[in-house]
């Protein structure tokens, strides 16, 4: 059987990166002969099989022909007469159109290795324009490979713009966009995904809520980068530095959507943007059917990031109420940490502030621990119930956090903290 290692495994090995998964292309076989060899068919749209021992995917070499607009209008031809080069030619980028023989010889008919060395993301052929998903894939690869110096080849960017202008991206269903977006969020430089989409004109079609942030000014005293769109992508990259949690990264990306809705005559002030942005956030989440955990965390970060930045200035009662609204006073809560990381990313996502500490997070962590450690048994012994129990427990928590604050020196978060940004100014 002629089986060739293809795609990402070859690319990543040449880049010196860990190989995440190994995919194979088989030449000269049919579904019947593959099944006879013990392979299990799993492909729905084209012949893909699982190896009986390694369970790696083996696909029959195939060609594709476009028959309708969008990304679903394809006729697939998989047969023993399809060559390896024909299979590689249908792929998106030259760096993904390489194969390796069983004895380790590189098969590179489209210059993938050359483009790896030049750090270029270049499309293989004119067939690239037949599938709008490839715009998203190129953007996702920039999110992965920008830290290694990769950029989109000029001719590929031109082709992507033509596809957008022709309305190809309008045929993408939200679930497909979300699938690529979610993968991009997990990459080392997720902001590059959005920059690439903006460069080719696809951002305003697919993520208008993000596109509208560009050109909206913020107070230069707190935001030297000024532009809200620039700030948003800086925050996203800071979130990627701080956490691998995709929900926290999503919350960081969407926290300032309300600033795009501030009337221009009020610029650069954005008072009330936390409330203004909730509708845009829900529209985005509804459109892409975002997971509920993403939506809930993003809503909390949007509503309360300003209060988090002012944590040391808040009255103790307000601080306890904030923790309660965040759901952080439940003993097994796991949402406070991603909330704090998203807020820290916001504070650091400003020109010149990237390495600033964010002691507000530690103060809120300590306050939360003090509040949840309160012993409620005396209230139970008093037979308090319902709202009366809740009010009494709140007072105990306020007293516990007040004691914590009093025990700290003025130089700590119980005293004064540097105000990270004037969100309402």
From Swiss-Prot:
EC number: 2.7.7.72, 3.1.3.-, 3.1.4.-
Taxonomy, superkingdom: Bacteria
GO biological process: RNA repair; tRNA 3'-terminal CCA addition
Cofactor note: Magnesium is required for nucleotidyltransferase activity. Nickel for phosphatase activity.
Enzymatic reactions: a tRNA precursor + 2 CTP + ATP = a tRNA with a 3' CCA end + 3 diphosphate; a tRNA with a 3' CCA end + 2 CTP + ATP = a tRNA with a 3' CCACCA end + 3 diphosphate
All residue ranges annotated as the HD domain in the record: 228-329
Residues forming coiled coils: none
Assembly with partners or alone: Monomer. Can also form homodimers and oligomers.
Entry protein name: Multifunctional CCA protein
Organism: Methylococcus capsulatus (strain ATCC 33009 / NCIMB 11132 / Bath)
Gene name for this UniProt entry: cca
